[in-house]
UniProtKB/Swiss-Prot annotation:
UniProt subcellular location: Cell inner membrane
A single GO cellular-component term on record: plasma membrane
Recorded topology in the membrane: Peripheral membrane protein
Quaternary structure and partners: F-type ATPases have 2 components, CF(1) - the catalytic core - and CF(0) - the membrane proton channel. CF(1) has five subunits: alpha(3), beta(3), gamma(1), delta(1), epsilon(1). CF(0) has three main subunits: a, b and c.
Source organism of the structure: Shewanella halifaxensis (strain HAW-EB4)
Name of the gene encoding the protein in the UniProt record: atpG
Matches recorded under InterPro entries: ATP_synth_F1_ATPase_gsu, ATP_synth_F1_gsu, ATP_synth_F1_gsu_CS
GO MF annotations, alphabetized: ATP binding; proton-transporting ATP synthase activity, rotational mechanism
Physiological role: Produces ATP from ADP in the presence of a proton gradient across the membrane. The gamma chain is believed to be important in regulating ATPase activity and the flow of protons through the CF(0) complex.
Name of the protein described by the UniProt record: ATP synthase gamma chain
GO biological process, one term: proton motive force-driven plasma membrane ATP synthesis
NCBIfam families listed in its UniProt record: ATPsyn_F1gamma, PRK05621.1-1
Length: 286
């Protein structure tokens, strides 16, 4: 058994760690609330944009944009959104597992795969995973702007325009609630059709002044908005996961302190008992 002094040092060390994890929990809770506000503000735009684009994909268009054409999936691209930092439980691990499972299916079907990473963790993982990383962005902070992502996203869009990609997906953690974040893979290109079920009529649009100019701008904006929404959702998920992880760490530290305190008391009691025994033995010898 360790002596009382060593145990006391361990208790002090665990208490210091507990203070740090408790502070990180409170910071994460504050950041999560702000991230939720940003997510709630941008989610309606992204969802309605997806609905409109879904109807466009169903419609009979006078100008057939390349993003609407379904090609054989020989090369597939993934825009993977992760965190820059750790200490957020299994958030990144679960996301990477989902991507790897989907990549395995694509490769079994004979497709080649490349990645665009947003977040330092995904860049580290996919560089070691062995996939081709065509573009990356990191250090976006807790409140990224669309302009911070445009350059990275455009690399994948240009690859799609040049026929180097036949499918493009975005992967991120969707915020469900504080306790639940779900990794999702959403198709960006070719444009997914609306999921609202059967239509009672055909969706046709009149484009003014020029359908090509309008669709070229609108469809690029759609892809950018979906990636941005994925980043915002992932940040909210990150802070929620970090808050839960730090709370668990704080609680575990408390339990460890209690256990160490019990061991300390036993060690101290044993030391006192030994001293008394030595005193009694010395007195008896005299």
């Amino acid at each position: 058994m360790a002596n009382a002094k060593e145990i006391k040092t361990k208790i002090a060390s665990v208490k210091n760690t507990q203070k740090i994890t408790s502070a990180m929990e409170m910071v994460a809770a504050s950041k999560m609330r702000r991230a939720q506000d940003r997510m709630a503000a941008s989610r309606p735009y992204a969802e309605n944009m997806r609905k409109v684009i879904g109807h466009v994909a169903q419609g009979s268009l006078e100008y057939k944009h390349p993003y609407l054409e379904v090609r054989e999936a020989k090369r597939v691209g993934y825009i993977v959104v992760s965190t820059d930092r750790g200490l957020c439980g299994g958030l990144n691990v679960n996301l990477f597992k989902k991507v790897i499972a989907d990549v395995k299916k694509q490769r079994e079907a004979g497709a080649e795969v490349e990645f665009c990473t947003i977040g330092a963790r995904s860049a580290q993982f996919f560089n070691s995973f062995g996939g081709q990383v065509s573009a990356s962005a990191s250090g976006l902070g807790d409140a990224p702007k669309l302009v911070d992502l445009i350059g990275t996203v455009r690399v994948m869009l240009e690859a799609y325009n040049e026929g180097k990609l036949d499918r493009l997906y975005v992967v991120f953690n969707k915020f469900v609630n504080t306790m639940a974040q779900t990794p999702v893979i959403e198709q960006l290109l070719p444009l997914p059709k609306s999921e609202e079920g059967e239509f009672t009529h055909q969706w046709d649009y009149i484009y003014e002044p020029d359908p090509k100019l309008l669709l070229d701008t609108l469809l690029v904006r759609f892809v950018e908005s979906q990636v941005y929404q994925g980043v915002v959702e992932n940040i909210a998920s990150e802070q929620a996961a970090r808050m839960v992880a730090m709370k668990a760490a704080t609680d575990n530290a408390g339990e460890l302190i209690d256990d160490l305190q019990l061991v300390y008391n036993k060690a101290r009691q044993a030391a006192i008992t030994q001293e008394l025994s030595e005193i009694v033995a010395g007195a008896a010898a005299v």
